[in-house]
Amino acid sequence: MRIVLDTNVLIAAFVSRGTCHELLEHCAIRHRVVLSPFLIAEFRTALVRKFRFPASEADEAAGLLESRFENVTPPPLRESVCRDPDDDHVIAAAVTAACECIVTGDRDLPDLRAVSGVRIVSPSEFWAFEAG
């Protein structure tokens, strides 16, 4: 399955060894993870500003993501579908890469449930689906 992992899931995977870390490892092995330059830049910026990572470590983490996962540069959406315009970048990446789902901890995105055939799920909903 082709999946976009939202920035908040990626950050949680890197800063703790919890659910999101396990989810990232699982998806890296079993699925095709798709990212975009916007998601990677947002990830790097959050590590430095919010979590006080040294820039060199944030660059290394971002480089690891770029080397391990597919990277797409989506065109902007024709119309905004999210309250937060940054969330439109997540949707655009998933639609451009023909992903089946977006995994996010963002409370606004799951309210949409699906956009252009892309399901939007929380990490716990993703695990429930995988346990199937």
Predicted regions: what they are:
Residues 41-42, 77-82, 126-131:
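A short acidic, often aromatic-flanked loop/helix-cap motif at beta-alpha or helix-coil junctions
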Residues 17, 40-41, 109, 127:
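Alpha-helix N-cap/helix-start and coil->helix boundary motif
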Residues 1-35:
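Short, well-structured N-terminal submotif of metal-dependent ribonuclease cores
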Residues 100-101, 107-132:
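Acidic, PIN/NYN-like endoribonuclease modules and their adjacent C-terminal/linker elements
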Residues 26-78:
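PIN-domain endoribonuclease scaffold, especially VapC-family toxins
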Residues 6-7, 35-36, 105-106, 122-123:
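A secondary-structure boundary/capping signal
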Residues 67-102, 107:
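Active-site neighborhoods of divalent-metal-dependent phosphate/nucleic-acid chemistry enzymes
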Residues 12-14, 46, 112, 129-130:
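Residues that scaffold the ATP/ADP-binding catalytic core of kinase and kinase-like folds
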